[in-house]
Amino acid sequence: MRIGIGIDVHQFAEGRKLIIGGVEVPSPIGLLGHSDADVLLHAISDALLGAAALGDIGKHFPDTSPDYKDADSMELLRHVCKLLEQEGYKPVNVDTMLLLEKPKIAPYIDQMRRNIARCLGLEINAVSVKATTNEKLGYVGRQEGACAHAVCLIENA
């Protein structure tokens, strides 16, 4: 068994959809990025890649490549799962924490968990998505961006 940790940050921008955990969350602003900027799925991808010592998402999906322009991060996560499988690993569980002031995402957490569980081939009780504010401190508190942390456990397939 191996443990991985991932973190991702994206700034907010006008004219972008807010996609978190594969769910489009109603919001007047979204997250800026080369792909769909799904901060939660990016953190999970990094955690899984790290657990298998396969580098990070920047190595596998560079933001300089037109191939990943506006990419669906759920598809990127599926690719990460294939990389794990090729190395003889499979995910066991994922625990995540999302930091943002607004909008409140509690109504969307169950769907995020279902999306992630389905993508990783896990039962929903093996996927945790939590959210908190930053108590108005720092870039998250000023509503300039969002941050996600993820920890995962993988095992030999």
Curated annotation (Swiss-Prot):
Keyword Membrane annotated: no
Catalytic activity of the protein: 4-CDP-2-C-methyl-D-erythritol 2-phosphate = 2-C-methyl-D-erythritol 2,4-cyclic diphosphate + CMP
Cofactor comment text: Binds 1 divalent metal cation per subunit.
Biological process terms in GO annotation: isopentenyl diphosphate biosynthetic process, methylerythritol 4-phosphate pathway; terpenoid biosynthetic process
Binding residues annotated for 4-CDP-2-C-methyl-D-erythritol 2-phosphate, in chain numbering: D8, V9, H10, H34, S35, D56, I57, G58, T132, T133, N134, E135, R142
Pathway(s) annotated for this protein in UniProt: Isoprenoid biosynthesis; isopentenyl diphosphate biosynthesis via DXP pathway; isopentenyl diphosphate from 1-deoxy-D-xylulose 5-phosphate: step 4/6
Family per record: Belongs to the IspF family.
UniProt cross-references to PANTHER family, sorted A to Z: 2-C-METHYL-D-ERYTHRITOL 2,4-CYCLODIPHOSPHATE SYNTHASE, CHLOROPLASTIC
Record protein name field: 2-C-methyl-D-erythritol 2,4-cyclodiphosphate synthase
Source organism (scientific name): Chlorobaculum tepidum (strain ATCC 49652 / DSM 12025 / NBRC 103806 / TLS)
